[in-house]
Amino acid sequence: MEGNGKLKIGDNCFFNNYCSITARDSIKIGNNCIFGENVKIYDHNHCYNDKDLLICKQGFSAKEVVIEDDCWIGSNVVILKGVHIGRHSVVGAGVVIYKDLPANSVVVCKQSLVSIKER
């Protein structure tokens, strides 16, 4: 956590090796979630609107991340700020999640094609 960031992890969650969770605002993870190796979760991003100011001096924008109960997040997944992942969802290895997923979603990346469907 950084600054006033809040992290809540539910019961019976498993995190494999090298997972990273960085909260400047809030990250909430439900019960019975499984995370593969090297999963990254960020609730913030660097600001970069002022081209005359170094990016590292422009601060951050942040928005809560929520992962509901019984989700399986595969290895090397990146979850970005503001995302809400509905319960019983599966995210396949190597996917970058940048928008909300409804409950019972399955998300996989096949080369350059991203497929989202109901479970």
State each model region's role.
Residues 1-83, 110-119:
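Flexible, glycine/small-residue-enriched loop-and-beta-strand segment within the central core
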Residues 72, 78-80, 86-96, 104:
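A generic "structured core" feature
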Residues 102-103, 108-111:
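Acidic, glycine-centered active-site loop in nucleotide-sugar glycosyltransferases
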